[in-house]
Regions:
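Hydrophobic/aromatic beta-strand elements that line small-molecule binding cavities or substrate pockets
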Residues: 55, 72-77, 89-92, 103-109, ...
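Residue-level preference for beta-strand/loop junctions
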Residues: 69, 82, 86, 100-102
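Short beta-strand edge/turn micro-motifs at domain boundaries
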Residues: 101-131
Length: 131
């Protein structure tokens, strides 16, 4: 398996874990001191503890549309030794039939033979979504 294939599989595993509610599985793919620019918050999240806090702050309105599908596509992956840069588009489908298009950039590092995300930046695309 190429590094690019392995990294892309891990990116997709994060989304699968999100849909399954498996935060431990997601966190296992993140470096302990990961940094995250979340689309819903302005501040930079630093580390798994603050990430867990961010998750708890997310609204839990049972009447709000829920995420039903995450379609990661169009990956552009560059690898330089033990560092990789991943850019992709994420289509988020909600239970009310609406969609959001998210642009995502993440940085990955290989440590002890495993690729872990060290930074993630997501941005809800404006201007009508996909061109």
């Amino acid at each position: 398996m190429t590094d690019e294939t392995e990294i892309w599989a891990r990116v997709r595993a994060i989304y699968d874990g999100f849909l399954a509610g498996d935060t431990d599985g997601v966190d296992a793919l993140l470096q302990r001191d990961v940094t995250i620019w979340d689309s819903a918050e302005f501040s930079l999240t630093r580390g798994l503890g603050p990430l867990r806090d961010l998750r708890r702050r997310r609204p839990h309105d049972p009447g709000a549309p829920a995420v039903t599908k995450l379609d990661a596509r169009d990956p552009v992956i560059d690898v330089w030794g033990d560092t990789a840069l991943v850019r992709h588009v994420l289509i988020v489908e909600l239970s009310d039939g609406t969609r959001e298009t998210v642009r995502n950039t993440s940085v990955w590092r290989r440590a002890e033979g495993a690729w872990l995300a060290v930074h993630n930046h997501e941005d809800i695309a404006g201007g009508g979504g996909l061109p």
